[in-house]
Amino acid sequence: MDIWKFYDIRHRGLLLCNPMNEEKLERLCRLFRLERGTRALDIACGKGECLVRLAELYGITGVGVNISPYCIKDCLEKKRARVPEADIRFIEMDGAKYEPEHGESFDLTMCVGASWVFGGHRGSLRALSKITRPEGLIAVGEPFWLLDPSEEYLKTEGIRKEEFGTHSDNVKVGEEEGLVCLYTLVSNHDDWDHYETYQWWAVDDYVRTHPDDPDNLELLEKTRVGKESYLRWGRDTVGWAIYIFRKSQKA
């Protein structure tokens, strides 16, 4: 099954493609306190909600990059509906391959919930720092361990314990890269439950309305495994937060 089709089906109806609610997103956007014309970049931009909202609030200019054709379609439709005149471009490509016309050119760079694009949390911060102007902001979303994961959980999810750290570790990694952590926005159980369980509902809706899709068996099996993993281990094992850093003059 095409991975981006799978991702699209599971996230249909969700405003955000991560375990954060709309109130927290609005709070985050207002905390940025950006000036009109601020240049923003969002790698793995999901459905474009953050950039569109920033355009509504501040009149930013921006670029959103996503490898999924389904997400880019959603981004373009959202832009047309809400900020048709905004100077925002959405590009379908691998975020790791995106290169701006000029180096340290963005006032705000983001990669929220997709550090795998750059090989992990540290790699994501390094990549974003290279294209963020001095004194600019960097926003990343990253999982963290609430407790030591069981071997069963790691095997089921196909991940290694070393791929993530603690909440404190995520802050320290940024500081080791010469960044200043300004703020963290941590998801709670309600955020996680909405994000995870809404996907079960979305899959159920899809299978009932597309009974002849040959991908349904794989879709249902992956959802079954993910549901069991979340309820048995993930809900109490993994946290998630957005981290806001400022790039210092020396970074």
Residue ranges and their predicted role:
Residues 18-36:
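Conserved alpha-helix/loop element of class I SAM-dependent methyltransferases that forms part
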Residues 41, 49-97:
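Class I SAM-dependent methyltransferase SAM/SAH-binding core
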Residues 108-120:
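A short SAM/SAH-binding and catalytic strip from SAM-dependent methyltransferases
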